[in-house]
């Protein structure tokens, strides 16, 4: 360590917000270059390279072939798939000296597709799966959590190309199986969850989440063991309500009833229910005005805005992230005053269905607003809701009888105890970090970029694609996040920067000679070693650094070696401490390390 490019820190960096970011910097694995941008130091690269080696072994094992694309990419392919616009501010864009547009790659779907298009033309060339491990770039608005949410990161991305949908599915499950083996070998707990495809497009997707409290993603678990990303949850179909005995809708004055609580109080005082119970928040149809910011598309030459209204039960709140996933690649925001001015029929506090969507024409509305409802609003249900006049509401307005909608969406937050989509029981929730995702892309990119091959009949057909990503640098951070204690990191043996941390203590040259001999014996057995040969550093500091760096095994060569020729062996956490004769130390350490692997 006296010559190793390494400096450990005693204090946590002031801006480190999660344990992995604190420990990786303190232990000398990474250094911050700028927000969301990190320099890899020798120890960090050792671990990163070992993770990459495991990924390569498993991905090569399913027949994939490695390539390497540039990170600086031209604009044109991304325009063809509309992702130049869809990514918005999330990508780094630049111009060369000739004013040509480029971007720093956030992903490489377009480039992989064009490469196969350039080289392959027949069904006989397929199937093929290509992958790379490469640096990606995304202009995160607020980088956080160290390597977990950065602007520059290392990612493994693979793409399968097959002649038909069946081939795509086979490639998908081959890759999925390889992912499970990778995470198991890395000793990283994971949960596969059903997910939305988002801007990537495609028909099916699963995320691999590492459960941990700092995770940005919430996922739902069913008693059956199945799991869903919250955005991908679907509400089990609810039975239609028989509205034959529901009183006719009535429109009544409701002064001072702009809030849910005011509406409930007013309803119970002025309009008692006929079914023996009081009005409650779940009886109120809350209509939320939202602006959809669409990117450019085939019908619009520039981004455009659309105002919509979403109806949800009054006891639920709109989950914008969940709702936005269904509008991808568009973005959602609460409607502005300027948006509302375009629709004078929307009376704040009293917005109701009777001027929206299918009802707009009968109400004389010339610029109708699309009306969507959450899946918890079932046909036949009667509602207390706005009447589109100031201080006036409807009672007993029945969905299906009195008003219709333009569509049904998953709009509200999901609660603990809600029924799971598979009907196996109530949902519970955990948080996790996405470490991988697999997509069945289908024909999205092959059609957009005209990737076709001749089939067995000589007909040009589009190629079926799959996409598979692992956040390599994020995986490293997640392992650090889940493999540490108060003293420091505790790496799984398979990716630790070394097998043994040899510590020479004291001032006697004999101890250092014994340590050097042990290092040579360990290296002769093929074991990597970190050797702390610093002579002006106290034993206490050396032991603290050994715990901080997190190598699985520690060997102490000091006073006991000088006095009786023994070397102390122990695990990183200080357990299984034993003194062995120096001649047996290398073999004992090799056996211990083999047992860990």
Swiss-Prot record:
Keyword Ion transport: no
One GO BP annotation of this record: prolyl-tRNA aminoacylation
Cellular compartments annotated: Cytoplasm
Keywords assigned by UniProt, alphabetized: Aminoacyl-tRNA synthetase, ATP-binding, Cytoplasm, Ligase, Nucleotide-binding, Protein biosynthesis
SUPFAM superfamilies: Class II aaRS ABD-related (SSF52954), Class II aaRS and biotin synthetases (SSF55681), YbaK/ProRS associated domain (SSF55826)
CC annotations in GO: cytosol
InterPro entries: aa-tRNA-synt_IIb (IPR002314), aa-tRNA-synth_II (IPR006195), aa-tRNA-synth_II/BPL/LPL (IPR045864), Anticodon-bd (IPR004154), Anticodon-bd_dom_sf (IPR036621), Pro-tRNA-ligase_IIa (IPR002316), Pro-tRNA-synth_IIa_bac-type (IPR004500), Pro-tRNA-Synthase_IIa_type1 (IPR023717)
Gene3D superfamilies: Anticodon-binding domain (3.40.50.800), Bira Bifunctional Protein, Domain 2 (3.30.930.10), YbaK/aminoacyl-tRNA synthetase-associated domain (3.90.960.10)
Domain notes: Consists of three domains: the N-terminal catalytic domain, the editing domain and the C-terminal anticodon-binding domain.
Protein name as it appears in the record: Proline--tRNA ligase
Organism of origin: Bifidobacterium longum (strain NCC 2705)
């Amino acid at each position: 360590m006296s010559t190793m490019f390494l400096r450990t820190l005693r204090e946590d960096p002031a801006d480190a917000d999660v344990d992995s970011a604190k420990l990786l910097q303190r232990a000398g694995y990474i250094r911050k270059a700028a927000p969301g941008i990190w320099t890899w130091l020798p120890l960090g690269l050792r671990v990163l390279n070992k993770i990459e080696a495991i990924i390569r072994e498993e991905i090569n094992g399913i027949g994939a072939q490695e390539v390497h694309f540039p990170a600086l990419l031209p604009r044109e392919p991304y325009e063809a798939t509309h992702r130049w616009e869809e990514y918005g501010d999330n990508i780094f864009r630049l111009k060369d000296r000739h004013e040509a547009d480029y971007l720093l790659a956030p992903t490489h779907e377009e480039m992989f597709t064009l490469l196969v298009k350039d080289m392959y033309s027949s069904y006989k060339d397929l199937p093929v799966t290509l992958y790379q491990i490469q640096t990606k770039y995304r202009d995160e608005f607020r980088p956080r959590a160290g390597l977990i949410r950065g602007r520059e990161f290392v990612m493994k991305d693979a793409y399968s190309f097959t002649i038909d949908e069946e081939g795509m599915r086979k490639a998908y499950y081959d890759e999925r199986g390889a992912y499970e083996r990778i995470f198991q070998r890395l000793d990283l707990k994971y949960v596969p969850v059903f997910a939305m495809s988002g801007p990537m497009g495609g028909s099916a997707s699963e995320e691999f989440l590492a459960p941990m409290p700092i995770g940005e993603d919430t996922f739902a678990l069913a008693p059956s063991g199945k799991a869903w990303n919250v955005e991908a949850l679907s509400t089990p179909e609810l039975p239609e309500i028989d509205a034959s005995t529901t009183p006719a809708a009535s429109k009544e004055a409701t002064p001072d009833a702009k809030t849910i609580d005011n509406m409930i109080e007013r309803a119970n005082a002025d309009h008692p229910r006929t079914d023996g119970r009081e009005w409650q928040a779940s009886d109120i149809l809350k209509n939320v005005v939202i602006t959809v910011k669409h990117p450019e598309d085939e019908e619009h030459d520039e981004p455009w805005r659309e105002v919509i209204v979403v109806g949800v039960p009054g006891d639920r709140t709109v989950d914008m992230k969940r709702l936005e996933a269904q509008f991808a690649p568009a973005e959602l925001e609460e409607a502005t005053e300027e948006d509302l001015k375009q629709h004078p029929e929307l009376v704040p506090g009293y917005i109701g269905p009777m001027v929206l969507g299918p009802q707009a024409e009968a109400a004389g509305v010339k610029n109708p607003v699309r009306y969507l409802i959450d899946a918890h609003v079932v046909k036949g249900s009667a509602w207390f809701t706005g009447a589109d006049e100031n201080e006036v509401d409807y009672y007993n307005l029945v969905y299906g009888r009195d008003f219709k909608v333009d569509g049904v969406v998953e709009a509200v937050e999901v609660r603990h105890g809600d029924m799971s989509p598979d009907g196996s029981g109530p949902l519970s929730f955990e948080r996790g970090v996405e470490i991988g995702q697999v997509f069945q892309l289908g024909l999205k990119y092959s059609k957009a970029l005209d990737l076709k091959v001749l089939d067995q009949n000589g007909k040009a057909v589009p190629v079926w694609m799959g996409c598979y990503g692992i956040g390599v640098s994020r995986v490293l951070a997640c392992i650090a996040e889940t493999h540490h204690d108060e003293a420091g990191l505790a790496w799984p043996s398979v990716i630790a920067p070394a097998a043994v941390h040899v510590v020479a203590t004291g001032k006697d040259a004999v101890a250092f000679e014994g340590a050097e001999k042990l290092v040579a014996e360990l290296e002769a057995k093929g074991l990597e070693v970190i050797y702390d040969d610093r002579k002006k550093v106290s034993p206490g500091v050396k032991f603290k650094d050994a715990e901080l760096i997190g190598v699985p095994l520690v060997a102490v060569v000091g006073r006991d070696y000088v006095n009786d020729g023994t070397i102390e062996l122990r695990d990183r956490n200080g357990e299984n401490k034993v003194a062995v004769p120096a001649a047996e130390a290398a073999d004992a350490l090799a056996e211990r390390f083999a047992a860990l692997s």
